[in-house]
């Protein structure tokens, strides 16, 4: 009973420490953060008053906890970081002390259009940045490496794991997802906690570290979005404040509703059914908040800031492209555009370049395939293009996952309107072309019909129907498929007719020999609709897909010979089905130990959709032995307990992780540094000062000291990964049958059950 009472007292003491320190981001994790949070609270209080509200951290925390009970998730850091609303700025930004001071005083400063961090002291001096991991499992590390490769592919920075630079990034499993803005010196933390495990969120936090603020904090944001103030959680209105020239710079780039740095539509909402951000053009509503990866504009911001001197000369890029710092011989083009100088449509196996005429023409996507990536460019030189959708059929999501994107603005840098839920009204281009992009996710379910649209020329010098080739329907099976590190090419994919029949790679689609110009022409990747008099033109099976030449081949510019050539004969697709190419391998089911497996799948198309063999392929993976936990962690700790109680308790870990940590034996309670809950003096000291010591009081004090001396304390030393915002110690009574020395190997086996390690590799018994 006495031991149980002592255990309750110890647990109560630990619980009291936890209650007093409710912060999720401790001051020793981020330098000077206690002072930063005081300034941040003053900033939130100031902005709450502008809306007639008070800043009540307890009320905000209660709303956040209630929201966490919801299964809703917008796939942004906003969902994960609800409990951090009082700890961070704009959901995921860790401010430095100078930034916080500037933030509090900026409301009276002149405003200008700004968005990237302008202080040269926060710029990265080199284009190679060191990074390291601070704990975390291997699958988590691989995700971060994939996100870093994704960033590297789009900007001129290179990242070196475990590099020796003094300044760098340290990714660790903290509470939530957060980062500093710009370089702050030393190994600055980037927290990728549980729930932040996506390529887009890791990229988002990395771009913060490179110097980008959130997109919706730009001064010109009111031209593109409106803030629904009455839907925002009271007291968090300061998270919608706009930046000024004091701490950000737009670098002359337009506002991008598809930026990976943009808030989602429901950020800081007190009710998940409510939007706190509405786009001025409602067709963009499901575009904001995407976390698929960097947009063209996101990368252009970084490259404009850091990479303008990488190449010796600038290329004459079109359509707002710019010289690619990773390949100085080409331009980096906005989505939808391709070619050396961004003069053509982006190369895909489905889609192409089309010219509008005075009468409507039709584009049908067909059934949306997984990883579909198709791009069309519709032109009307000297005029505009009108687009009218008859069907938009995708899985509705906020933001869109699979979608049709329409770029109809005169500026090309920004992301287009992504449609997946609603049918838009008539769209008219601001310039002389429109870009249509079809995207499908890797896990797109079969059955979504995609989109159907019709287009025509408005103004300009439209071509009459008599001078153009028949209307073309399209397919959605890509030659290119998306991976975590970018788009990769699939050799010899199956070719499709509009009715869904398939031409496999070993079938000749036509006996007619085409010229090399025709094979390069994007129009040869299109097949006429069923109303056309001409049969499908299909790429011969022995020809490898080629990228378009530098000069774009428009349908209206085909030679007369091409328009009048004899109708080619085609081989009718057999009634039997055929397999598609294998998809990518899944992640391994185990990080090590020998028993892991990975799988890949393929689809059966055409005919009766019955193909020989299995659609599933399985392979063993990660046969290497599991590494034992390393000793020598950064921080040591100790727990003070009565010695007779300590011997009866089990702990969540053991000291086999570090044999150097031994129990240090007995120690007098008067010399032990007990936890300091507050700055108040002990109660019995106050009593001594206020009242003269009586005989009764002295007798009581003597008995108390005797009890403490007889009940000597022992210390339980332990190690833990630090910095940490929350340290949990698990204790329970040992079962009578349990020994005191658990085998280290039993707790941390090198191989799975049924496998034996030999020279670092696990083999099946």
Curated annotation (Swiss-Prot):
CUB domain mapped to chain residues: 350-458
UniProt EC number: 3.4.24.-
Effect of residue 214 to R: In ox196; induces defects in protease involved in ecdysis
Domain EGF-like: 303-343
Residues of the Peptidase M12A domain: 115-308
Residues engaged in binding Zn(2+): 204, 208, 214
Extent of Low complexity compositional bias: 526-545, 562-573
Chain residue ranges for the region called Disordered: 513-573
Glycosylation sites: 126
A molecular function (GO) term: zinc ion binding
Keywords attached to this entry: Cleavage on pair of basic residues, Developmental protein, Disulfide bond, EGF-like domain, Glycoprotein, Hydrolase, Metal-binding, Metalloprotease, Protease, Secreted, Signal, Zinc, Zymogen
Disrupted gene: phenotype observed: Worms exhibit incomplete ecdysis; at each molt the cuticle fails to open sufficiently at the anterior end and the partially shed cuticle is dragged behind the animal.
Cofactor details (free text): Binds 1 zinc ion per subunit.
Domain TSP type-1: 576-627
Compartment(s): Secreted
Broad class of the protein's primary localization: secreted
Residues the record marks as active site: 205
Cofactor(s) it depends on: Zn(2+)
Gene Ontology biological process terms, A to Z: collagen and cuticulin-based cuticle development; ecdysis, collagen and cuticulin-based cuticle; molting cycle, collagen and cuticulin-based cuticle; proteolysis
InterPro entries to which the protein is assigned, alphabetical: Astacin-like_dom, CUB_dom, EGF-like_dom, MetalloPept_cat_dom_sf, Metallopeptidase_nem, Peptidase_M12A, Peptidase_Metallo, Sperma_CUB_dom_sf
UniProt name for this protein: Zinc metalloproteinase nas-37
Gene designation per UniProt: nas-37
């Amino acid at each position: 009973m006495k031991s149980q009472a002592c255990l309750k007292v110890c647990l109560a003491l630990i619980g009291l420490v936890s209650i007093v320190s409710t912060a999720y981001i401790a001051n020793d994790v981020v330098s000077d953060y206690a002072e930063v949070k005081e300034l941040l609270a003053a900033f939130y209080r100031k902005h709450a008053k502008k809306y007639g509200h008070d800043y009540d951290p307890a009320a905000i925390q209660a709303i956040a906890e209630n929201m966490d009970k919801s299964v809703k998730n917008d796939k942004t850091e906003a969902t994960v970081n609800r409990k951090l609303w009082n700890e961070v700025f704009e959901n995921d930004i860790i401010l430095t002390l100078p930034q916080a001071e500037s933030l509090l005083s900026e409301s009276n400063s002149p405003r200008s259009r700004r968005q990237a961090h302008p202080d040269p002291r926060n710029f990265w001096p080199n284009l190679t940045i060191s990074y390291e991991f601070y704990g975390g499992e291997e699958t988590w590390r691989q995700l971060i490496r994939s996100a870093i490769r994704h960033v590297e592919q789009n900007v001129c920075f290179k990242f070196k794991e475990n590099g020796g630079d003094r300044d760098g990034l340290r990714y660790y499993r903290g509470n939530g997802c957060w980062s500093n803005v710009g370089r702050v010196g030393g190994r600055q933390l980037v927290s990728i906690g549980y729930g932040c495990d996506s390529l887009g969120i890791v990229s988002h936090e990395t771009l913060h570290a490179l110097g980008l603020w959130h997109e919706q904090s730009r001064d010109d944001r009111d031209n593109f979005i409106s803030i629904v103030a009455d839907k925002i959680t009271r007291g968090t209105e300061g998270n919608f404040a706009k930046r000024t020239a004091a701490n950000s710079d737009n670098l002359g780039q337009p506002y991008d509703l598809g930026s990976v740095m943009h808030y989602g539509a429901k950020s800081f909402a007190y009710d998940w059914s409510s939007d706190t951000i509405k786009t001025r053009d409602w067709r963009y509503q499901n575009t904001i908040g995407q976390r698929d990866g960097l947009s063209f504009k996101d990368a252009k911001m970084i490259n404009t800031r850091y990479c303008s001197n990488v190449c010796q000369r600038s290329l004459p890029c079109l359509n707002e492209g710019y010289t690619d710092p990773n390949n100085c011989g080409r331009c980096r083009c906005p989505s939808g555009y391709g070619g050396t100088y961004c003069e053509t449509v982006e190369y895909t196996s489905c889609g192409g370049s089309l010219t509008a005429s005075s009468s409507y023409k039709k584009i049908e996507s067909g059934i949306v395939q997984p990883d579909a990536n198709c791009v069309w460019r519709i032109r009307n030189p000297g005029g505009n293009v009108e687009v009218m959708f008859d069907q938009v059929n995708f899985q509705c999501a906020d933001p869109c996952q699979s979608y049709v994107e329409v770029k109809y603005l005169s500026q090309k840098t920004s992301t287009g309107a992504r449609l997946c839920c609603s049918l838009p009204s008539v769209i008219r281009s601001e310039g002389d072309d429109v870009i249509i992009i079809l995207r499908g996710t890797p896990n797109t379910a079969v059955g979504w019909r995609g989109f159907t649209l019709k287009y025509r020329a408005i103004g300009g010098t439209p071509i009459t129907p008599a001078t153009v080739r028949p209307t073309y329907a399209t397919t959605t099976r890509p030659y290119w498929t998306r991976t975590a590190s970018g788009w990769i090419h699939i050799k010899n994919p199956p070719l499709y007719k509009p009715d869904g029949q398939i031409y496999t790679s070993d079938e000749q689609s036509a006996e007619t020999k085409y010229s090399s110009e025709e094979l390069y022409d994007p129009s040869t990747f299109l097949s006429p609709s069923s109303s056309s008099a001409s049969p499908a033109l299909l790429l011969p099976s022995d020809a490898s897909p080629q990228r378009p030449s530098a000069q774009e081949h428009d349908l209206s510019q085909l030679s007369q010979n091409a328009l009048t050539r004899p109708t080619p004969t085609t081989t009718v697709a057999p009634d039997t089905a055929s397999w598609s190419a294998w998809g990518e391998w899944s992640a391994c089911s185990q990080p090590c130990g020998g028993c892991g497996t990975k799988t890949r799948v393929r689809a059966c198309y055409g005919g009766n959709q019955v193909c020989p063999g299995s659609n599933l392929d399985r392979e063993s993976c990660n046969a290497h032995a599991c590494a034992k936990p390393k000793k020598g962690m950064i921080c040591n700790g100790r727990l003070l307990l009565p010695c007779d109680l300590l011997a009866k308790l089990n702990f969540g870990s053991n000291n086999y992780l570090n044999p150097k940590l031994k129990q240090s034996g007995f120690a007098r309670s008067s010399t032990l540094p007990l936890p300091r809950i507050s700055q108040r003096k002990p109660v019995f000291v106050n009593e001594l000062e206020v009242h003269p010591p009586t005989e009764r009081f002295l007798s009581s004090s003597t008995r108390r000291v005797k009890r403490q001396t007889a009940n000597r304390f022992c210390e339980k030393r332990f190690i833990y990964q630090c910095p940490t915002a929350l340290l949990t110690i698990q204790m329970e009574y040992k079962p009578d049958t349990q020994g005191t020395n658990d085998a280290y190997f039993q707790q941390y086996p090198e191989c799975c059950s049924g496998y034996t390690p030999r020279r670092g590799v696990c083999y099946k018994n």
